[in-house]
């Protein structure tokens, strides 16, 4: 049984960044993984600030395995690349006022997959990328293009060459299980029958209505349904019990559990407004387990490589979930 509830995180976790941490291997027993939903191998995002893409695709991968019987290892960098190309055009037309960054939130990963499709990890997995360096390079090219009024066609070609190389045949499509797919067709097939419901819980907006979540990385101003946190907790438990993974975004667990004594909604609101809870990281919740005291723990699949945590996984307590969750994505059963 699990001996320890928490991964002791380094002080840098106080900063809002989702890139890979220094190695912090936890030697806790891995027996809890027997309670996990089936997943693909843990990925390592390295210096790519796109945990939200990694977490979302991890959910799609597990959903496909558990409920459709097919194992697909998907390429987060495919969406990162398309996002930067998209932002280059937007930044150019806005004369440099639109941001160029790979930071975002879960609903935008869903949007990108629908818009640009997907390819397999084995066909597009460039190594040692630094998303901040790529964003700076794109911004530089946008700035030059604006200065010389080059137009979108020339800019798009220059940005395309600057980003990680895509084999020509991959652009045209690929074969999988004897069927030919373009990236767009493959993305559509992955999402067939899968729809996420995005949920958050804060008092400064009425429950039962959507609102544009005011976090720094919600560049697209996605509106999220607002519900009481206990209702969200129950939906997450139910989803996992029915073999559906859950997308999670929020503040990573700290050494000390947060208190849930008192009005939960007020505790959450205070943590948000004082920036104790930030939209720091995203993971896929892929199962439930219990400690020796019988407390429920969430099994979280991270994207910081297998050398981090417990073979790339960590455990989240009920208290951490109730206080530190910014938003979740639950598969819509309807």
Annotate each language-model stretch with its function.
Residues 2-8:
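Sec-dependent signal peptide recognition
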Residues 15-17:
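C-terminal motif of bacterial Sec signal peptides marking the signal peptidase cleavage site
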Residues 19-28:
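Bacterial Sec signal peptide processing site at the extreme N-terminus
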Residues 21-22, 35, 40, 155-334:
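Active-site signature of cysteine proteases
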Residues 50-53, 78-81, 109-112, 120-123, ...:
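Structural recognition of the beta-strand scaffold that forms the well-ordered cores
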Residues 56-65, 114-118, 241, 290:
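Sec-exported extracytoplasmic/periplasmic mature domains
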Residues 73-177:
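Papain-like cysteine protease catalytic cores
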């Amino acid at each position: 049984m699990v001996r320890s509830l928490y991964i002791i995180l380094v002080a840098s976790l106080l900063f809002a960044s989702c890139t890979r941490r220094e190695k912090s291997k936890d030697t806790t027993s891995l027996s809890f993984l027997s309670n996990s939903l089936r997943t693909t191998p843990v990925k390592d995002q390295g210096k790519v600030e796109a945990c939200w893409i990694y977490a979302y695709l991890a959910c799609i991968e597990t959903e496909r395995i558990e409920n459709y019987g097919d194992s697909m290892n998907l390429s987060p960098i495919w969406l990162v690349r398309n996002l930067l190309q998209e932002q280059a055009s937007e930044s150019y037309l806005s004369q440099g006022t639109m941001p160029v960054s790979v930071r975002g939130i879960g609903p935008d990963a869903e949007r990108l997959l629908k818009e640009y499709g997907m390819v397999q990890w084995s066909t597009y997995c460039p190594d040692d990328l630094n998303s901040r360096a790529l964003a700076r390079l794109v911004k530089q090219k946008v700035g030059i293009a604006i200065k010389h009024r080059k137009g979108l066609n020339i800019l798009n070609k220059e940005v395309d060459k600057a980003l990680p190389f895509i084999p020509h045949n991959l652009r045209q499509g690929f074969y999988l299980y004897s069927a030919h797919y373009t990236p767009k067709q493959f993305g559509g097939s992955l999402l067939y029958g899968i729809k996420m419901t995005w949920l958050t819980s804060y008092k400064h907006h009425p429950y039962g209505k959507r609102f544009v979540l005011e976090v720094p990385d919600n560049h697209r101003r996605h509106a999220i349904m607002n519900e009481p946190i206990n209702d969200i907790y129950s939906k997450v438990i139910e989803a996992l019990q029915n073999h559906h993974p859950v997308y999670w975004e929020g503040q990573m667990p700290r050494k000390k559990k947060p208190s849930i004594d008192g009005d939960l909604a007020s505790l959450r609101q205070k943590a948000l407004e004082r920036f104790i809870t930030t939209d720091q990281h995203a993971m896929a919740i892929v199962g439930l387990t219990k400690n020796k005291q019988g407390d429920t723990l969430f099994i979280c699949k991270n994207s910081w490589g297998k050398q981090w945590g417990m073979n790339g996984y960590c455990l989240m307590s009920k208290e951490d979930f109730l206080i530190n969750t910014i938003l979740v994505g639950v598969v819509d059963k309807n």
